[in-house]
């Protein structure tokens, strides 16, 4: 790239934020393509050998990673194709935009998928968000990226995904691909153990998954597991790992119980229907000395967000391979272990925290005022105080609250919701506002953020081989209903930007 690193020693150090986000972008669509029970470590290294400062390299790296796995001896059900598309000022989706074209567009979206035997493309991963030009373009007549336009973008992406897959197949056909290894497949439990656990504890497992409160449900699960272990363990005394097998079988049956109730009865763990939201609350001005603060709670998920204002010298200097040199709007997300009732080291942000912070940052970016309208540096921090699913989307809601509490004239309030999916016997059941357990036992985590009129950010991960675009379109419509409900609750807490805090005024002037 023709750049000397900006660090003190002028040498590459650990992976920076952009590299971590690119790694996550690559990992997410590739992971479901490995066979069930495959536990061998696979290390895929993407090295940027050259960067022209015009074309993004992340999607190129994703396609390259898929191609590398396809021509290796690793069991991998590929290829996976990926494309970045942009919604232009003229209201068209264009593929593989340059950095400049992306900045001038209203919305960018990375879509990855696999080609099915019938020629269709199953979507495996989506990462999308509005740009700094979104609001101005919408004001000047560019069609807003709503659910319908986004669904059209998913359909449009299939053509270019197929082209990426075709290129990879050309590579596969041109080289001697070694035979795929037959790795040892880890079996979580023997059939006999599974049946013994089912006989001893199925009814108890089902009952434990009908307890709405997370702490009470967790205690009930531990009690049921202990009862099953006491009943079943003596039957397999000769098995070296009997305890582990029994615990794995209990988890598998728990997953079955949760999914069966959702598909057959339309009832979830906490008794909600598939479209129901948990209890909501929103509050601002929680910390008087903060420039802005917002507390958002959805069920047992609670996030406290802070906004801090600074002058230009507080901008973040960016030292990576992109053309961006500095950032005046930052969002940092912290997920301490106490938020899930656990202990652990707190040594700085992990990859997940960096990813969630970037998603929440992207969700608010289109509505943050430009430097000309608001000449301040903005740092937002989301502190997860309690977690039971969808803390990143709670961070989006908390961000809106704290920005308005700080007096930042955002273009419009933004809210976010996490959607889930259960697939069984050819039927897709979409869930609104998923719990942590529904994320773990379900087949999709689909996060959607936006205003009342348009979408500002979106992220999709799936454990399936892919999700039909029609199912995603329905999930988008369902998410909009939930988003509007969230915005109603937030509007009751604060309906317009407040006056700037005296603490902020004394600091910034």
Annotated model-derived regions:
Residues 1-42, 48-55, 122, 127-142, ...:
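Glycine-rich, flexible beta-strand/loop modules in the N-terminal catalytic cores of phosphate-handling
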Residues 9, 13-35, 39-46, 55-75, ...:
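Alpha/propeptide regions of enzymes that mature by internal proteolysis
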Residues 28-36, 71, 311, 336-341, ...:
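Conserved helix-loop functional segments at active or binding sites
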Residues 75-203, 406-496:
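Mobile "lid/hinge" segments at catalytic clefts and subdomain interfaces of large enzymes
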């Amino acid at each position: 790239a023709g750049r000397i690193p900006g660090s003190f020693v002028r040498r590459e150090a650990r992976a920076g934020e952009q590299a971590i986000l690119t790694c996550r972008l690559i990992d997410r669509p590739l992971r479901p393509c490995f066979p069930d029970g495959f536990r061998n470590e696979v290390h895929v290294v993407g090295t940027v050998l050259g960067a022209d400062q015009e074309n993004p390299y992340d999607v190129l790296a994703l396609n390259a990673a898929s191609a590398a796995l396809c021509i290796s001896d690793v069991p991998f059900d590929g290829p996976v194709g990926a494309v970045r598309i942009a919604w232009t000022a003229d209201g068209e989706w264009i593929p593989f935009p340059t950095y400049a074209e992306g900045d001038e567009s209203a919305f960018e979206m990375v879509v990855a998928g696999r080609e099915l035997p019938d020629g269709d493309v199953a979507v495996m991963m989506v990462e999308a968000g509005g740009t700094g030009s979104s609001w101005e373009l919408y004001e000047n007549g560019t069609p807003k990226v709503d659910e319908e336009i986004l669904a059209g973008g998913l359909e449009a992406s299939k053509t270019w995904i197929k082209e990426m897959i075709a290129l990879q197949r050309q590579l596969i056909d041109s080289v001697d691909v070694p035979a795929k290894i037959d790795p040892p497949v880890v079996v979580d439990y023997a059939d006999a153990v599974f049946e013994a656990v089912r006989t001893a504890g199925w009814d108890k497992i089902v009952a434990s998954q009908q307890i709405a409160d997370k702490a009470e449900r967790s205690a009930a699960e531990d009690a049921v597991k202990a009862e099953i272990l006491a009943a079943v363990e003596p039957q397999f005394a000769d098995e070296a790992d009997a305890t582990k097998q029994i615990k794995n079988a209990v988890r598998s049956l728990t997953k079955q119980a949760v999914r069966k109730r959702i598909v057959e009865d339309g009832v979830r763990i906490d008794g909600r229907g598939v479209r129901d939201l948990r209890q909501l609350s929103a509050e601002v001005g929680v910390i008087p000395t903060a420039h802005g603060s917002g507390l958002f709670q959805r069920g047992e998920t609670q996030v406290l967000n802070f906004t801090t204002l600074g002058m230009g010298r507080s901008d973040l200097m960016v030292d990576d391979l992109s053309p961006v040199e500095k950032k005046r709007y930052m969002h940092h997300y912290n997920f301490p272990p106490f938020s899930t009732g656990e202990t652990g080291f707190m040594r700085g942000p992990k990859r997940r925290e960096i990813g969630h912070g970037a998603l929440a940052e992207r969700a608010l970016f289109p509505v943050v005022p430009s430097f000309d309208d608001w000449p301040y540096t903005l740092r937002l921090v989301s502190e997860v105080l309690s977690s039971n699913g969808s803390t990143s989307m709670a961070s989006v809601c908390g961000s809106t609250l704290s920005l308005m509490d700080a007096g930042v004239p955002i273009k419009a309030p933004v809210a976010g919701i996490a959607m889930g999916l259960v697939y069984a016997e050819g039927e897709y059941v979409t869930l609104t506002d998923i719990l942590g357990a529904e994320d773990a036992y379900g087949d999709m985590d689909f996060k959607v953020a936006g205003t009342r009129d348009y979408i500002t950010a979106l992220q999709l991960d799936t454990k399936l081989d892919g999700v039909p675009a029609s199912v995603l379109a329905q999930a988008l419509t369902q998410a909009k209903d939930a988003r509007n409900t969230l915005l109603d609750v937030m509007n009751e807490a604060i309906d317009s930007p407040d006056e700037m805090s005296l603490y902020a005024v004394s600091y910034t002037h």
